[in-house]
Amino acid sequence: MTIDQMTIDQMTKIFLADKESTLNLGILLGETLTAGSVILLEGDLGAGKTTLVQGLGKGLSITEPIVSPTFTLINEYTEGRIPLYHLDLYRLEPQEVLSLNLEIYWEGIEIIPGIVAIEWSERMPYKPSTYINVLLTYGDEGSRQAEITPFNCTISDLIATK
């Protein structure tokens, strides 16, 4: 399946049978999203947010291991097709997030534009003008569900045409 075939221009729910399915969704997004794309990730602990970002890295041809930046807050991976900026706001309060000036990542200020993936994005006091929200929830027997919602954009606005 390609991202074009998914036609996610409004909220779409995708069943993810296992960890590999979550990884594959990330790979698909990494292969097709363009620089400037922002993915806001929500979900309980262990729901698959980091796994999805690991897939993004694979889709971007990043070879170094993608790890959760829970304690470093931001991990930057710049050797792929385009850079990946992986943020984790789990330990922060909204006022602390405000002081990070996250807009430098999605506006490409002082950094090379890339894909921005933010775990625990519900802690953000403000959001970019356009983004994709991905809510990961638990299903039965280890499965997950991804609820993907574009805000002020369509997926087709964000994908690279070949």
Swiss-Prot record:
Entries under Pfam families matching the protein: TsaE
SUPFAM superfamilies: P-loop containing nucleoside triphosphate hydrolases
Positions that bind Mg(2+): T50, E119
GO cellular component terms attached to this protein's record: cytoplasm
Binding site for ATP: G46, A47, G48, K49, T50, T51, E141
Chief location: cytoplasm
Keywords assigned by UniProt, alphabetized: ATP-binding, Cytoplasm, Magnesium, Metal-binding, Nucleotide-binding, tRNA processing
Cellular compartment(s): Cytoplasm
GO molecular function terms attached to this record: ATP binding; metal ion binding
GO biological process, one term: tRNA threonylcarbamoyladenosine modification
The UniProt record lists the keyword tRNA processing: yes
Similarity comment: Belongs to the TsaE family.
Reported function: Required for the formation of a threonylcarbamoyl group on adenosine at position 37 (t(6)A37) in tRNAs that read codons beginning with adenine. Is involved in the transfer of the threonylcarbamoyl moiety of threonylcarbamoyl-AMP (TC-AMP) to the N6 group of A37, together with TsaD and TsaB. TsaE seems to play an indirect role in the t(6)A biosynthesis pathway, possibly in regulating the core enzymatic function of TsaD.
Classification via NCBIfam families: T6A_YjeE
Record protein name field: tRNA threonylcarbamoyladenosine biosynthesis protein TsaE
Species the sequence originates in: Nostoc sp. (strain PCC 7120 / SAG 25.82 / UTEX 2576)
Gene name for this UniProt entry: tsaE
